[in-house]
Amino acid sequence: ARPEYLMNMEGTRTILNKSYRLPKLIHAKANKLISRIEDRVDKEWTSRDENGQVNIYPVEQLQKMKEGNWLVLARDRYRLDKLEEDLKIYGYFYERGDRTSINKRIHQAILAWEDVRKGKAVDIKAVRSFYNYIVTGRGVSKEFKEMKNVNKEKLYTYDTLVSDYGLSVNKEKPWFDALRNIPLPKATYVRAVLRRKENIKRAPRIKLSTI
């Protein structure tokens, strides 16, 4: 039936003002939603005594964050904790406080390895960052694992590292095959971020902060 037809019918109206099905939290949520409808018959009604539980599934909201820059503000830290968990599940790259969602050391190692295998020369700090995540004895010799007693002012190329500094990982291998010591959950997350075409060389588009 059309709502306006029922609303305009003549007769006696009896309001059922007690719900024996909806708990308190659901009742409050329902009232908040229904209040958005302007042309309606208002009524006062109560819930049952139990509190109940409201679970928010953020998939549709997260879809809106696929593009553009976002600053997400929350009054309570626990709300950001939940959002942060969901952003990680769905592979979003974000920043909270002074840290990004990708571990700093892992982030540096990935970028450094990708630079080296593409022919760029990098400094000793960059070499150490990715050597740390290469399996000793299989991808880099134990002698050079920590790159001690080497020229700290020098720039290093892939060919130089192979010939003189114990590297044996094929440069055709992407970071997730070369840097096998990155913990699997962290590597899986970074790969999910990259599948979203996020640019991890730049600051994250999404920033989380408390008010």
Regions found by a protein language model. Name each.
Residues 58, 74, 210:
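Pocket-edge structural micro-motifs
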Residues 51-61:
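Short acidic-hydrophobic, aromatic-tinged amphipathic segments that line or gate anion-handling sites
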Residues 4, 59-63, 195-201:
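Short, flexible, glycine/charge-rich loop motifs used to bind or transfer phosphoryl groups or to couple energy/partner
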Residues 13, 54-56, 94:
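Generic structural signal for residues in well-ordered beta-strands
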Residues 24-27, 77-211:
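Core RecA-like ATPase module of SF1/SF2 helicases and allied nucleic-acid translocases
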Residues 1-50, 67, 71-86, 97-104, ...:
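Conserved helicase motor core of SF1/SF2 NTP-dependent helicases
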